């Protein structure tokens, strides 16, 4: 089986650098939508559970992504993404 030499192909950012940048971006976005003390408690939970490990970084990235997705989907006031409540004049619902 043919393989490309290791020094060819697109340059990729090291995984740990990418993960830390992603975590920083998610943290900043989460701070716009959730209370700081609540996020601090969440961070403490992950630190107490995983310690200072990459497994903990991956777990908090997944959790923040899920929280933000659900928050947007429910209908964040800061975003146009999500389910917009529809008003009905006569109260009838369409199924």
UniProtKB/Swiss-Prot annotation:
Modifications the protein undergoes after translation, according to the UniProt entry: Phosphorylated on several residues by host. These phosphorylations regulate VPR activity for the nuclear import of the HIV-1 pre-integration complex.
Sorted alphabetically, which InterPro entries does this protein's record hold? RetroV_VpR/X (IPR000012)
Domain of life, source organism: Viruses
* Pfam families found in the cross-reference section: VPR
Q: Name one GO biological process term.
A: DNA-templated transcription
* Primary site of residence: virion
Quote the cellular component terms of the Gene Ontology held in the record.
host cell; host cell nucleus; host extracellular space; virion component
Positions of the UniProt region annotated as Homooligomerization: 1-42
Coiled-coil ranges per the record? none
Post-translational modification Phosphoserine, affected residues: 79, 93, 95
Q: Where in the cell is it found?
A: Virion; Host nucleus; Host extracellular space
UniProt keyword terms in alphabetical order: Activator, AIDS, Apoptosis, Cell cycle, Host G2/M cell cycle arrest by virus, Host nucleus, Host-virus interaction, Ion channel, Ion transport, Modulation of host cell cycle by virus, Phosphoprotein, Transcription, Transcription regulation, Transport, Viral penetration into host nucleus, Virion, Virus entry into host cell
Q: How does it assemble?
A: Homooligomer, may form homodimer. Interacts with p6-gag region of the Pr55 Gag precursor protein through a (Leu-X-X)4 motif near the C-terminus of the P6gag protein. Interacts with host UNG. May interact with host RAD23A/HHR23A. Interacts with host VPRBP/DCAF1, leading to hijack the CUL4A-RBX1-DDB1-DCAF1/VPRBP complex, mediating ubiquitination of host proteins such as TERT and ZGPAT and arrest of the cell cycle in G2 phase.
Also noted in the record is: HIV-1 lineages are divided in three main groups, M (for Major), O (for Outlier), and N (for New, or Non-M, Non-O). The vast majority of strains found worldwide belong to the group M. Group O seems to be endemic to and largely confined to Cameroon and neighboring countries in West Central Africa, where these viruses represent a small minority of HIV-1 strains. The group N is represented by a limited number of isolates from Cameroonian persons. The group M is further subdivided in 9 clades or subtypes (A to D, F to H, J and K).
Q: HAMAP family given for it?
A: HIV_VPR (MF_04080)
This molecule's function is given as: During virus replication, may deplete host UNG protein, and incude G2-M cell cycle arrest. Acts by targeting specific host proteins for degradation by the 26S proteasome, through association with the cellular CUL4A-DDB1 E3 ligase complex by direct interaction with host VPRPB/DCAF-1. Cell cycle arrest reportedly occurs within hours of infection and is not blocked by antiviral agents, suggesting that it is initiated by the VPR carried into the virion. Additionally, VPR induces apoptosis in a cell cycle dependent manner suggesting that these two effects are mechanistically linked.
Per the record, the similarity remark reads:
Belongs to the HIV-1 VPR protein family.
Name of the protein described by the UniProt record: Protein Vpr
């Amino acid at each position: 089986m043919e393989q490309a030499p290791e020094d060819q192909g697109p340059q990729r950012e090291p995984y740990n650098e990418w993960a830390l940048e992603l975590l920083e971006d998610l943290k900043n976005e989460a701070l716009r939508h959730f209370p700081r003390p609540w996020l601090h408690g969440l961070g403490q939970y992950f630190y107490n559970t995983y310690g200072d490990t990459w497994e903990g970084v991956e777990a908090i990235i997944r959790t923040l992504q899920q929280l933000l997705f659900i928050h947007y989907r429910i209908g964040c006031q800061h975003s146009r993404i999500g389910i917009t409540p529809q008003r009905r004049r006569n109260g009838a619902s369409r199924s």
